[in-house]
Every structure is written in structure tokens, then in C-alpha cells.
């Protein structure tokens, strides 16, 4: 199966699993996905994740986080897509919900939140917004 946007697929799997109130979700592994998951874990949006090998293929098992019976992530939106890439300079990085959410940015210094990119003085490709 040819997948044109693996990041959007990962975000959709997380959204669907939370809508179905699943405890965990399994996705194919990649370095970029693991970098995004590390940010989600550090910011408190997911419980944990771990890389596993099943049938000779690497995948990531994500433990989702809930609070008061509802998912912690209320919105998970892909911004830059393969057909239309979205880039932002350090001065134009978005503030999500006035600082209550995060934007994940792929920069020359790695994948980071928009706050880290602004503090580091770098811009980059806006991957997704989490609130």
C-alpha cells in the first residue's frame, strides 16, 4: 500500500483511537514519527510510547492519555501536507490557543515545539498543531 503522508496517517490513527477510547494504538515506525511522539510525551499529551518489532517490521506502540474520562488531546491537525508545504519564519510561528496548545515544527536543528523554535531563533516547516 502506497502511503503519501505517513504523518497524517499517524495523527489520524491517534485521533480515531482516542475517539474509540482505546488505551493504545500501534503505528509503523520512522525517525520523524518518533521525534513527534517524543514531543507529545514531553508536553503531556500521551502517556508513553515504545518501539517494538513484530513480524520483522518496526512499529511504535503509543499509550494514550485521558483526563476525567475524556482524551487529553482535543485537536490534532496536520498543517504542512505533501501537496502544499507550509513554512514559517521564527517571527511568524503561530501561538496555538494563546499558548495552551503547541505547534510542532521541523527545523534545521531538529523537530521541536514552536516555543523552542522561537527561543532558538529558527523557523521551519509547520508539521501539526496539538491542542
UniProtKB/Swiss-Prot annotation:
InterPro entries listed in its UniProt record: Ribosomal_uS8, Ribosomal_uS8_CS, Ribosomal_uS8_sf
GO cellular component, one term: ribosome
Keyword presence, Ribosomal protein: yes
A Pfam family annotated for this UniProt entry: Ribosomal_S8
A GO term for molecular function: rRNA binding
BP GO terms, sorted: translation
Source taxon at top rank: Bacteria
Role this protein plays: One of the primary rRNA binding proteins, it binds directly to 16S rRNA central domain where it helps coordinate assembly of the platform of the 30S subunit.
Family: Belongs to the universal ribosomal protein uS8 family.
The protein's name: Small ribosomal subunit protein uS8
Organism: Nitrosomonas eutropha (strain DSM 101675 / C91 / Nm57)
